[in-house]
């Protein structure tokens, strides 16, 4: 059986969850349509998602059509959940991008399409809600061409009046874009030679799967218009990006979820091989796990299975698998499936409204951070405050609501702050010798540090010979330094520097790698005290798309948010502004843009790097480490 995995993406309220229900219903997977309003849909099944009318976590369901099984990934549709979007995109064979016929291309539509293009996902545009009053499809087509891509193929003719009718084009009017994009076909067409339908279809298929051509279909998910045709398109146009024939097992964990009974589930996309119940499987070329229970989605329901084939999405109950873990042969994982998660740029202090719920809060955060790599937390060693790092305002609102709904814990939030970095100010060296108090470890370590230009990152090298200090000791020093770099003099991550391991001494047989691992961060702290450090704050590069009439307002507001606009373009009655802005200002600038453009602006951002800050340094308390904190304190007293 052919197995394909598709994503359904859209801006808020475009109807993606309703479309998922219609696909399930028309294919026979379910016998009754669920309702978004009543909260009976197969996806968006948490109270929070139903209340907000948005998808927050990736939902998975499926249907079967003839000899094809289709797994549907109902992805989030908000800026703060793009990490969840990217994780779900990584397992897709294709995507359906919904566009409301009434609303046209919205800001979130553009952001999602940008993600699809970046990931190289073949995409179909589905214009939904064509049965609403006042629809002008020609305006929607123009909107798509100007804001998404001009390389579209209108696959259907839509008659709205007097009776709605959607029919597939069969003549040459749909092929203009296909012909124009191929020099050989264009030359043949211009010379008057006939073009065979087969060669046009082949060219369309090639460009569709290369993400350089996007077919457009129409319908109404709510009133079951165009859904049967869309099912045919899905099962015929998309194909699975899996290894055919016998091969080694390869699968990737793309989602971790906890059930109401606190069972930990790992969602895995299989790219090759067969996974059997009771198999012992190697994970990320390290440890092995045993498959004791295995589930998959069958016609909208989770069912136990005893084997799963390449292309399938399976769910394992497992305590050890992590997000992005690879089962089996890592070399067989498709290259485009590897993606870096963005770094959280903000942090906030939280506390339970009821002090007696502190342990419940910590347990809940442990589960939430396990399933969301963009949420991290630690407990301050001095104040015992709980500090979260996160991406955006809505993400924090959702976490607060999730804690209340699922874990029955209410929290109070302080003002968020940006996450800084540190860089050494000058070159410095420091050595701690073995058997010289207060050093309690059987190790000597000498380090040097020197600042590097912005954008260089942290570089490490060892000038100590492996012939003298073997690899296990050298690795321990490097691990200790990486740990020490997590907290500089002001408590922030140390970067933009070169650290050199210059001197090492051990006593055989009493010295162990642990001695070097624990001493290294203490030496690093002392050498940083000699060098001094400066704070760096994160800067984002941005690209703003806004209606042309808002150009002057966007320019005038830029200095207020410390934004520097470096390039301006005018295109299709739209202004495109490029520049950079401190991360601490982006939330307000984006909110302001959305407000004064009435939601018609788009602001895409990426981390550009770090700039030196001015003013008083912002300090962050150190995280505790019971094994070395006492020694740190003793060295700090004598230095």
From Swiss-Prot:
GO terms for biological process: response to antibiotic; ribosome disassembly; translation. SMART domains: EFG_IV. Residues 1-242 form the tr-type G domain. The keyword Cytoplasm does not apply. InterPro entries: EF-G-like_DII, EFG_II, EFG_III/V, EFG_V-like, G_TR_CS, P-loop_NTPase, Ribosomal_Su5_D2-typ_SF, Ribsml_uS5_D2-typ_fold_subgr. GTP binds at residues 10-17, 74-78, 128-131. Transmembrane segments: none annotated. CDD domains: Tet_C, Tet_II, Tet_III, Tet_like_IV, TetM_like. SUPFAM superfamilies: EF-G C-terminal domain-like (SSF54980), P-loop containing nucleoside triphosphate hydrolases (SSF52540), Ribosomal protein S5 domain 2-like (SSF54211), Translation proteins (SSF50447). GO terms for molecular function: GTP binding; GTPase activity. Keywords: Antibiotic resistance, GTP-binding, Nucleotide-binding, Protein biosynthesis. Abolishes the inhibitory effect of tetracyclin on protein synthesis by a non-covalent modification of the ribosomes. PANTHER family: RIBOSOME-RELEASING FACTOR 2, MITOCHONDRIAL (PTHR43261:SF1), TRANSLATION ELONGATION FACTOR G-RELATED (PTHR43261). Belongs to the TRAFAC class translation factor GTPase superfamily. Classic translation factor GTPase family. TetM/TetO subfamily. NCBIfam families: small_GTP, tet_protect, tet_protect_M, tet_protect_M_W. This is Tetracycline resistance protein TetM.
